[in-house]
From Swiss-Prot:
Keyword Coiled coil: yes
Domain notes: The BTB/POZ domain mediates the interaction with some component of ubiquitin ligase complexes.
Protein name: BTB/POZ domain-containing protein DOT3
Protein origin, superkingdom: Eukaryota
Keyword annotations from UniProtKB, A to Z: Coiled coil, Phosphoprotein, Ubl conjugation pathway
Amino acid sequence: MNSVSAAERLKSFGDAGPVCNKSIIFPSRVVTLANSFEKKDRSWYVKSQIPTDLSIQVNDITFKAHKFPLISKCGYISSIELKPSTSENGYHLKLENFPGGADTFETILKFCYNLPLDLNPLNVAPLRCASEYLYMTEEFEAGNLISKTEAFITFVVLASWRDTLTVLRSCTNLSPWAENLQIVRRCCDLLAWKACNDNNIPEDVVDRNERCLYNDIATLDIDHFMRVITTMKARRAKPQITGKIIMKYADNFLPVINDDLEGIKGYGLGKNELQFSVNRGRMEESNSLGCQEHKETIESLVSVLPPQSGAVSCHFLLRMLKTSIVYSASPALISDLEKRVGMALEDANVCDLLIPNFKNEEQQERVRIFEFFLMHEQQQVLGKPSISKLLDNYLAEIAKDPYLPITKFQVLAEMLPENAWKCHDGLYRAIDMFLKTHPSLSDHDRRRLCKTMNCEKLSLDACLHAAQNDRLPLRTIVQINTQVLFSEQVKMRMMMQDKLPEKEEENSGGREDKRMSRDNEIIKTLKEELENVKKKMSELQSDYNELQQEYERLSSKQKSSHNWGLRWQKVKKSFQTKREDEETRERTRRRSSTGQRTSFRRRMSMS
């Protein structure tokens, strides 16, 4: 049945239509013919002494009733020409696409027979739509079903947000009737108004009621939920409230991303696995409809996210980004989420940044996220050390991936500007982990990777560890040793400067020559220390040069030994060839001599 009202259908008959029975006057006893109903198989029968004369089919259920009680209250039935039944006496009527189905029509049938009517939030919306379908207006009887259901919705349902939620849920299968009758709009407006006005309630009351209201709103179907959120935004609800409801809805209806991932390989990462594998083909074949529903839900939720920062957590944004990638959301939506994450990156953690890796460009999302952060916080990045710490921890995690190319690791390591790091200990730890996981890197790649690290920003403990780290290139080790010596020198100088004022105060009454001699001794000591540092530097440089020459000598020796081996094989082969030729000649000579002796013996025997 389309959404055309029963009144319009009545007018469409015109003068050429069937004769209406609205002028018939029914005795009061006619409408009290039925005391109850009974069901046999898939049919409902009215218990009455008068035989039924009307068969009404709703879906696959047939109702046996009397024509007059229905005509007296239903304008639609009174306006159409009833067709005689072919199987039995009376008339037959089939109601197509009846709102609420057979259960709702059973309630209406009881109402037409003046049996008690039980209106409640569960059945009032279907009854309101069905009464509109049958055109049960005041024109046919005062207090008809349209007015009763409308009054119940207005004065009972809309007075309670719990009843309003119940009615709104019952409207899911009543489209387009519930929309045209403004039932959905009124319910959504009431819920949005209630959610917005909870801000003015004291906090102790909000804690009890707010959670229930928000949780119940987050259980609606996606269409009605979007209507409520859109109305809340139009009423200028607080972004934190809107974001809280959206996050709750995602928890209820979107799957946890790990449930859709298979073949996880952690490579010793414990709980923070990096290597995700999504069996997309199997997922789409087994539940293609469910995947499409999840994709539409994601796109709907992202479209109504409040633009204000802090409305939703960075953890939630990264979760939505992961889910969007898994369910192949639109590139524009993924880009929007990346921008949102970039603006809230300071609140993220390493586990949130571990995005499913099933594409060829698995690191591009992380790179763009950091780029968006730098664009948004370009002036404030110095005051946010949490970002450099986050990147250090993230690099340490992805460095454990044996399939991660060095170029992608280096791009991420160079994302933040140099002044964003106060200390490079975390970066050193990540580089060391990468070198440990990728032992086959060439010396050139090792030097290139270590250039991203500033040795001057390493702590003393990190320098001492790096000085004994054989995974680092030799040049980096020399630089770190130099840095260690320089740091020790600076520390000693600072200690001397701290002690100098104390000594001056103690000996303030001493002679001027003693002060000068003490200063000269300090200067002499510092010069000796500086000479020692220079000497150690020259020793390290000479050691480095010797090692470099030894390496080159060994490399050239290996090449020369390899060439000598080839030449020796050639000489050996030539000697072997000559020897084989000599042996061949010797056999030929022996055979020829043997043949001559045989022929001589034959000649002697013949003679």
